[in-house]
């Protein structure tokens, strides 16, 4: 039902005005569709094998009110309609904002931007990121009259007004498996741009293609591979597994894991072929790594894939290039005011607005065991970003320790609802300190040690006799060199 306060406001409006009459109709229509949402009923119907009516999916915060009523069997979108014309305009602005930021800070154009291309870009944002990729390399979509993509067109250098920026794309497994046409379109565009008769200082795609060709006996196709993912049938970037297992000592260890897991090429005539050497070569030319946020409903702490892929790619590019590689984050939450900021600034923004926000913490505590576990997972991802990129400020770890470990009220909440979550939080903080990723004050160090011993006592007192398998926590540092199976599997990657 419509909120009572809103009803009172509506009573004061002159509904005889035609403009307000139309708005009223829209409000009442939205309210009716919200009331018609039957999610639980649809779930039960599905369990019983009944028909569930179909409906579109999307973010209502992006104006997609057609997703109402919910509880329908939702479908995605026509993959041959992305990027849409409106998304292309947003993508163009994103590309120019990224280039402008790098020019202002580094006094030069970025030659190669490594992009984590997520399915949310296509399914929620109609291909803004895809459009950004196209504009960076200097091409634009060509549409049929019905809005479907016909092909791409080359933007002349004179019209573009700058060099063509190279891209290295780690595409998500969902895009790979559900939107192969989008991958093939970008791949064809990259090959076309690499073959243009243009000066190398104006076409970084061509420049890097020739460099790779010189190391691959003149193989043009090897030189133009820019889209990579994990092995067919697999997902995730691998880096997060190494981080969570503490299976690394230095940045190079995470770089090797990322390279091994993600060195499989995808494109028009190549699908899932192992191309680790070519992947390593193109990563050497990366100047910037990049991802973007499209909605506050999801952020870079929402899944380990964010730091595993974007963070892993940053670690790999820095290790292989032996140079400073910037990490940027785009923001299209407000499509009218797109931004590109440092990854460190995006981390600060999300930490302040969610993780350390008292209102957010209060709302999570309402969910008891699950809420405690979710807090622990997000803190683990903060650690993951620091492990892979070193872009997390010390004050963030300080405040996490003070808020969740040293605060008596919150500590009691974890003790009563999920002491394992507090054990994980404390252990990750201790690991960050021991690895030199964070330099806490002495009082914080002392408190962490004390609380960790308390947690061990809680768990020993309450866990009882364990007769089956049991997973405990520890900080054991194990790398590929120490596990014979891993060592054998990654032998070729280690040589790169």
Protein language model features and the residues they cover:
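Ligand/cofactor-recognition surfaces for anionic moieties
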Residues: 1-496
